[in-house]
Amino acid sequence: GKIKIMYDSACHLSTLADALEIGRICDEYGFYWYEDPYKDGGVSIHGNKTLSQNLSTPILIGEHIRNPETSVDLIVNGASFFSRADPDYDGGITGSHKLVVASEGLGIDCEIHSCGPAMRQLMGASRNSNFYEVNLLHPNCSNPWSLPIYLNNYSDEINCIDNSGNVKVPNFP
């Protein structure tokens, strides 16, 4: 199969010009999305709309936004092609699900941020989410988000990904 490549700047790049330069590289290589491109904290409608209008790579804004209203504003104003929800920071599963449903109503995908049991449950209940983020993962070190506090051998280590590239949603506590 074909691998989709995404880039998450995590609002690290200093300027819109820097973000545009990196975005052009994302375009050249056919990236699936370009996430939180520069240090606006993910809230500049004008800056992110400018990027969206000048790049072919879709922009994903939302990792640093904590409410569905701001995310929807970014989407309807053409600043973000996707939304991003996180049950740890966005009002739990209920608050995050509100953004998932709002995004679905707008016809866009809502990607779930980070990993954990709540993220898997939210993604499993969402029609418009594509990728489970097993973040900060490398074959030679453990995932700092895979906490040893869960029952039934729950894990977000590399072995949680099956041979087909899927991650199961647990049906136990």
Spell out what each predicted region is:
Residues 10, 114-115, 172:
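Short, well-ordered beta-to-alpha junction loops that form the rim of enzyme active sites
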Residues 24, 30, 41-61, 65-166:
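Shared catalytic-loop signature of beta/alpha-barrel
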Residues 165-173:
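Short, intrinsically disordered, charge-balanced linker/junction segments flanking boundaries
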Residues 1-50:
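Metal-dependent enolase-superfamily TIM-barrel catalytic cores that perform enediolate-based chemistry
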